[in-house]
Amino acid sequence: MNAAIHVQGLNKTFSNKSALLDLALSIQPGEMVALIGASGSGKSTLLRHLAGLACCDRSNGGQVQVLGREVQSSGRLNGQVRRLRADIGYIFQQFNLVNRLSVMDNVLIGCLGRMPRWRGSLGLFNREEKQRAMVALDRVGLADLAAQRASTLSGGQQQRVAIARALTQRAEVILADEPIASLDPESARRVMEILADINRQDGKTVVVTLHQVDYAVRYCPRAVALKGGRIHYDGPAQDLSKPFLNDLYGADEDASLMITERSRRVRQKPRLVLAKV
């Protein structure tokens, strides 16, 4: 089976400082993987390279492939990267919604990568696309807010709109960059349950960067830990130990990042039951 994501020898330098160092990673179709690590470890940088939103170094920069297609190699993006991004849903930490638009219009933006530019620029979405967007909103529990302006939503609701947009996009790979970093515990739980259900029910490959190890253990079978731009651990999330995490984050890191006994005993099963889009 071809890997959903394949990274080989990836290097990225910012102002003579290495952000990613000879990084190699392979993720199989249908996996849900947590990228963990302290701030500045390279998590978000790696995710942006997977989506073709950033370029690796031109000299020995390495290669990134998604769904068997080259996204970039040695500092050059694939000329068809826009078409490739149609299969990659990207969920940003700060929601990345257009506040003046309605919830529905924000979700319909997910259709743009698979439609002619002229139709997208005019906002001419057909009935099937609108129905798909409404089904996606229903999945995340926001169908009744479709006509509401995005700016009026809470942070948790806005993040769920971003997930609905990725569903409408029909992305095969979903990359979520710190999707719960600014959310309250209940909103964070709901967002992670939705992502986990999309992974399990639809078989989508989901890669999520997390600062909260508790959530990585609870929802992601596999964890990849980065430190100084290198992979420091790659294995079962439940095997992460407190001594290892002390080394990864530093002994003085906030205790909320550590694994609770409940998380270690059993990964919580999602409570939401979602229909496929």
Swiss-Prot record:
UniProt GO MF annotations: ABC-type phosphonate transporter activity; ATP binding; ATP hydrolysis activity
SUPFAM superfamilies attached to this UniProt entry: P-loop containing nucleoside triphosphate hydrolases
GO cellular component: plasma membrane
Keywords for this protein: ATP-binding, Cell inner membrane, Cell membrane, Membrane, Nucleotide-binding, Phosphonate transport, Translocase, Transport
Gene3D superfamilies in the record: P-loop containing nucleotide triphosphate hydrolases
Domain named ABC transporter: residues: 5-253
InterPro entries: AAA+_ATPase, ABC_transporter-like_ATP-bd, ABC_transporter-like_CS, ABC_transpr_PhnC, MetN_ABC_transporter-like, P-loop_NTPase
Cellular localisation: Cell inner membrane
Chief location category: membrane
Enzyme Commission number(s) from the entry: 7.3.2.2
Membrane topology note: Peripheral membrane protein
Reaction(s) this enzyme catalyzes, per UniProt: phosphonate(out) + ATP + H2O = phosphonate(in) + ADP + phosphate + H(+)
Binding of ATP, residues: G37, A38, S39, G40, S41, G42, K43, S44
Top-level taxon of origin: Bacteria
Subunit structure of this chain's protein: The complex is composed of two ATP-binding proteins (PhnC), two transmembrane proteins (PhnE) and a solute-binding protein (PhnD).
Task performed by this protein: Part of the ABC transporter complex PhnCDE involved in phosphonates import. Responsible for energy coupling to the transport system.
Record family assignment: Belongs to the ABC transporter superfamily. Phosphonates importer (TC 3.A.1.9.1) family.
Annotated protein name in UniProt: Phosphonates import ATP-binding protein PhnC 2
Taxon lineage: Bacteria, Pseudomonadati, Pseudomonadota, Gammaproteobacteria, Pseudomonadales
